[in-house]
Curated annotation (Swiss-Prot):
Family: Belongs to the CarB family.
Binding site for Mn(2+) 3: 818
Matches recorded under PROSITE patterns: ATP_GRASP, CPSASE_1, CPSASE_2, MGS
Stretches for region Allosteric domain: 928-1020
Domain-related comment: The large subunit is composed of 2 ATP-grasp domains that are involved in binding the 2 ATP molecules needed for carbamoyl phosphate synthesis. The N-terminal ATP-grasp domain (referred to as the carboxyphosphate synthetic component) catalyzes the ATP-dependent phosphorylation of hydrogencarbonate to carboxyphosphate and the subsequent nucleophilic attack by ammonia to form a carbamate intermediate.
UniProt name for this protein: Carbamoyl phosphate synthase arginine-specific large chain
Species of the source: Lactiplantibacillus plantarum (strain ATCC BAA-793 / NCIMB 8826 / WCFS1)
EC number: 6.3.4.16, 6.3.5.5
Region (Carbamoyl phosphate synthetic domain): 543-927, 544-927
Annotated segments matching region Carboxyphosphate synthetic domain: 1-401
Reactions the enzyme catalyzes: hydrogencarbonate + L-glutamine + 2 ATP + H2O = carbamoyl phosphate + L-glutamate + 2 ADP + phosphate + 2 H(+)
Pfam families reported in the protein's UniProt record: CPSase_L_D2 (PF02786), CPSase_L_D3 (PF02787)
Signal peptide start and end residues: none
All copies of domain ATP-grasp, residue ranges: 133-327, 669-858
């Protein structure tokens, strides 16, 4: 069937800002699909508000609208752009919900826009809980006893009838938002009230709990002729009851019998046929571990998080092929880009095991509820490939970049009591895997662990094998025991920890078992493949990877977490483009399955590996690159630079010694003094007693900052001795013994610059001004370009300071500098690498900053790039505002008040001719607030309204606000803005606003600006 020639232009809806439940996988899918549609000859119109993505680059689509993903905004764009068709299934739940809203508003019909791919009727049937239940009954597919409810009374009645526990699943939500398991009437009432509020159609499914069953996923592809294939089967390590995004997942399925597998496979294909899916589709099923009974859990009629994992696990480009199907092609007509000889109708085959482990942000939110359930809490994930399940699991653990002690020991970092074991194993948190390994090392019977956790004994037996390998080393670290452990993926660090010796000693003792590299080819070696996609294993003798020659190796940034997000994948991809344009082969090492950088077509060769010295050095030894670039991999790559240099590896760009100088707080303070650059009065300490003395000498309030951390980890403002003790303890743990800077807190305007330098001169594309004052992490502050309140003299001084620092450090490539402006211009931080603002500044200046920085790293000068040293003049009549996006609604009891510790998961961009228009556009997708006219007023709490600064602000703006003491005091059916500066976990305003899906403001400067640019709100 030829492609659809009746249409010429296609609008694609992106997924918007990164948040828990909807992350970088949609940048990967959307980029892949847009490029495929362009290659097919269509005019592609992209609508997305996320500046941090490759998807919103001008090269990805013919027209890019960086605009809010609201019905009003998208309707306006569709009227102006006149697309023939709309493809919404690449934008996650956001894209689907917008497509439904556009249809219900009559926009698609009015503008005669054809919907591509899966129909709206199908989307509705899959997403609407009642409609889906009806379909399953018609297909004779078993589903748990359930009912659809719109109020609490009917839910309680149903639960009483079928018995507790029950599962609450809100309709049309993301990542299980608002859902949960209820064990009694009180829990059901609480969970349901939240779920009904968060569902855009005020609907929830109340379902008999099948927690404890095996959870199985199939990624299915179906074309326009009805040809269907299973792209990938996946099995969750954790049983039903834990969101699949928070579960460890293996591919292919590991524990089903052939009969069980075929039964579930048939069910998945039956459902996709009945729904008339056109493209990619994910189905989740539950298998009773004690019988052949299974149940259908749910389906996703779109590209999903699991699609990205399945694509990377198999090498099969799901989003690209889904886009091809959407324009009329069939699987038998689409070539598999991996083999370039077979067609997409062939089901992929795997001769390896893939493990995905989620990455959580509870290190950022120690007060948040870390228990896992049906609502997703992970911010990102890692993937690893191995010859055995043990090897894949241990490689994935090595990729997580968690606490080094836990990563080395594979156990909690403290003595665990029997009571704690039982609690952690029966009420799982993000640490359950490590408690399991500790329990197995301690000799707990496998059967008891299976009973406590409901995890399939097969998986526990694999963990038991790992524990035995470790016990052997602990008892007698012979070469045989070490080699056996290495073969199954036990890291050198873990072996050294238990053998009580150095990593170097272990490396020497295991040198006779080198890693070899195997290809990911989609066909288990059955056909010849050309994919440059490899993984390491200690099993096997044949190396399938051969040196490219004339290459540069680029370190990726690993899993997405707060402080190190998709922005660094953006810079990595652009670095690769510049390397290739310079005539080198580009090699990427990374382990994040969600990203564009780990698409094998991005680089000349991809190694899907942990970002550790143990895994990097054999790759470097094989490839012999001309150098390694670390500037675009965030703190992950920077932290590896020192060790790489010690091992004789050429690290390109700014020297490692200069990097260490800026990362070490004491050395950097000395540098600023030498250059006569203003800095806050302060000193460095390494322990609590010295901190108390320093605090009394400097005076409160103080800013406490550890060295070598990302995202403001363990940074805090301290006002007295009582607050100092826990903050210093946290900073010592986060910095692993490195100096902690304690300096005077400066209350002023914070701003920052990204700098391009060739070592002698520097170019500054723009100065960014923060709305929130110093003391709020730059990643959480609303950022404005060009600055609105900095005088020309201040801007000149910023340029002078940046130039001084770049020259002194001999910075080559990119650098980010943060300032506070009060009576003087003070430097507060320097990062000699790409920062999270690079995509934002690249979009608003129309300069490929990461590519330019890479060219400088490869030896070019600013002059040869045509860049004039100094500050770039901003474009006239354009204001660009970057606003943070938070996922507090997914992390109950987390602190919400903005502070030096970063909390946001993503960002959105608003652009306009004036500050006001740009502000409204940015707020629409970040705080879901366009103007005060759309709300009924302001709600705050007693602790917040008691603060003098708040009282002064309210009086100056003649505000009448509603003050609440309990969450139930929030006015029903009210569109209001919550405002709080109270960081207690039981804060009623934060809880109520998040439960009601209402805007929540947690910094006084944000509210000040909102009041300054919009009319005063009404009174509730």
């Amino acid at each position: 069937m030829p492609k659809n020639n009746a249409i010429h232009s296609i609008a694609v809806i992106g997924s918007g800002p990164i948040k828990i439940g909807q992350a970088a996988e949609f940048d990967y899918a959307g980029t892949q699909a847009c490029l495929s549609l362009k290659a097919a000859g269509y005019h592609v119109i992209l609508i997305n508000s996320n500046p941090a993505t490759i998807m919103t680059d001008t090269a990805t689509a013919d027209e890019v609208y960086l605009e809010p993903l609201t019905l009003t905004s998208v309707t306006k764009i569709l009227r102006a752009a006149h697309p023939d068709a709309l493809l919404p299934t690449l934008g996650g739940q956001t894209g689907l919900n917008l497509a439904m809203a556009l249809d219900q508003a009559g926009v698609l019909n009015e503008l005669k826009i054809q919907l591509l791919g899966t129909s709206l009727a199908t989307i509705n049937q899959a997403e609407d809980r009642a409609a889906f239940k009806t379909l399953m009954k018609r297909l004779h597919q078993p589903i748990p006893a359930s009912t659809t409810v719109h109020h609490v009374t009917s839910a309680l009645s149903f639960a009483e009838k079928i018995g507790y526990p029950v599962i609450v699943r809100p309709a049309f939500t993301l990542g299980g938002s608002g859902g949960g398991i209820a064990n009694n009437a009180a829990e059901l009432t609480q969970t349901l009230q939240r779920g009904l509020t968060m569902s855009p159609v005020t609907e929830c499914l109340i379902e008999q709990s099948i927690a404890g069953f095996k959870e199985i996923e199939f990624e299915v592809m179906r074309d326009n002729q009805g040809t269907k294939i299973i792209v990938c089967s996946m099995e969750n390590f954790d049983p039903v009851g834990i969101h699949t995004g928070d579960s460890i997942v293996y591919a292919p399925v590991q524990t089903l019998t052939d009969t069980e597998y075929q039964q579930l496979r048939t069910a998945a294909l039956t459902i996709v046929e009945a729904l008339d899916i056109r493209g990619g589709y994910n189905v989740q099923l539950a298998q009773d571990p004690n019988s052949r009974q299974y149940y259908v859990i749910e389906v996703n009629p779109r590209v999903s998080r699991s699609s990205a994992l399945a694509s990377k696990a198999t090498g099969y480009p799901i989003a690209k092929i889904a886009a091809d199907i959407a324009i009329g092609l069939n699987l038998s007509e689409i070539k598999n880009p991996v083999t370039q000889t077979t067609y997409a109708a062939f089901e992929p085959a795997l001769d390896y095991v893939v493990a995905k482990i989620p990455r959580f942000a509870f290190d950022k939110f120690p007060t948040a509820d870390a228990h896992l359930g049906t609502q997703m809490k992970a911010t990102g994930e890692v993937m690893a490939i191995g010859s055995t399940l043990e090897e894949a699991t241990l490689k994935a653990i090595a990729s997580l970049e968690i606490d080094p002690k836990t990563q080395a020991s594979l156990t909690p970092d403290h003595h665990v009591t029997t009571t704690e074991y039982i609690d952690q194993l029966t009420h799982p948190t993000d640490q359950r895997l490590f408690y399991l390994l500790a329990a197995l090392q301690a000799g707990w019977p496998l059967a008891k662990l299976a009973t406590l956790t409901q995890i399939t004994p097969f998986f526990l037996s694999k963990l038991q094998h790992i524990a035995q390998l470790i016990r052997n080393i602990k008892q007698v670290p012979t070469s045989q025991h070490l080699l056996s452990a290495k073969k199954y993926g036990v890291s050198l660090a873990t072996m050294a920890h238990y053998a009580q010796t150095s990593v170097a000693t272990i490396a020497a003792m295991t040198a006779d078992l080198p890693f070899v590299y195997k290809m990911v080819d989609t066909c288990a070696g059955e056909f010849a493949s050309v994919t440059p996609y490899f993984y390491s294993t200690a099993f096997g003798q044949t190396n399938e990877s051969h040196p490219l020659g004339h290459s540069i190796l680029v370190l990726g940034s690993g899993p997405i977490r707060i402080g190190q997000g998709i922005e660094f994948d953006y810079t990595t991809v652009h670095c690769v483009k510049a390397i290739q344009q310079a005539g080198y082969h580009a090699i990427i090492v990374n382990n994040n399955p969600e990203t564009v950088s780990t698409d094998f077509s991005t680089s000349d060769k991809l190694y899907f590996e942990p970002l550790t010295i143990e895994r990097l050095m054999p790759i470097i030894a094989l490839e012999q690159p001309a150098g390694v670039i670390v500037q675009f991999g965030g703190q992950t790559a920077i932290n590896l630079a020192h060790q790489l240099t010690k091992l004789g590896v050429t690290v390109l760009g700014t020297s490692v010694s200069a990097t260490d100088l800026t990362e070490d707080r004491q050395s950097f303070a000395d540098c600023l003094r030498l250059l006569k650059i203003a800095q806050a009065a302060g000193t460095t300490v390494t322990e609590l007693s010295g901190a108390r003395q320093a605090a009394h000498a400097i005076g409160y309030p103080l800013l406490v900052r550890p060295s070598f951390v990302l995202g403001g980890r363990a940074m805090a403002i301290v006002h007295n001795d009582h607050e100092l003790t826990p903050v210093i303890k946290s900073a010592v743990a986060a910095g692993h013994g490195a100096p902690i800077l304690m300096d005077q807190y400066l209350a002023g305007t914070e701003c920052e610059v990204d700098v391009l330098s060739d070592g002698t001169s520097c170019f500054i594309p723009g100065i960014m001004e923060h709305i929130e004052g110093a003391g709020v992490h730059s990643g959480d502050s609303i950022t404005v370009y060009p600055p609105q309140h900095l005088s020309p003299a201040v801007q000149d001084k910023i340029v002078t300071i940046a130039t001084k620092l770049a020259q002194h450090l001999h910075c080559v490539g990119m650098m980010n500098i943060q300032f506070v402006v009060t009576d003087d211009v003070y430097v507060i931080d320097v990062n000699p690498r790409a920062s999270r603002t690079v995509p934002y500044m690249s979009k608003v200046t129309h300069l490929p900053l990461a590519q330019l920085a890479t060219r400088l790293i490869l030896g070019q000068s600013l002059a040869t790039l045509g860049l004039v040293p100094g500050l770039l003049t901003p474009a006239p009549q354009q204001i660009a505002i970057k606003a943070p996006v938070f996922s507090f609604n997914k992390l109950p009891q987390s602190p919400v008040v903005l502070s030096p510790e970063m909390k946001s998961t993503g960002e959105t961009l608003g652009i306009g001719p004036t500050f006001t228009t740009a502000w409204h556009a940015a707020m629409a997708d970040s705080y879901h607030l366009e103007t005060w006219q759309t709300v009924d007023g302001l709600i705050t709490d007693i602790a917040t309204v008691a603060q003098p600064a708040v009282q002064e602000l309210f009086a100056a703006n003649h505000l009448t606000v509603t003050t609440i003491a309990n969450t139930t005091d929030w006015p029903a059916k009210t569109k209001a803005v919550g405002f709080t500066l109270n960081d207690q976990p039981d804060n009623p305003v934060a809880i109520a606003a998040l439960n009601h899906g209402q805007p929540l403001i947690t910094a006084i400067d944000t509210l000040k600006t909102l009041l300054a640019v919009t009319p005063t709100p009404a009174t509730i």
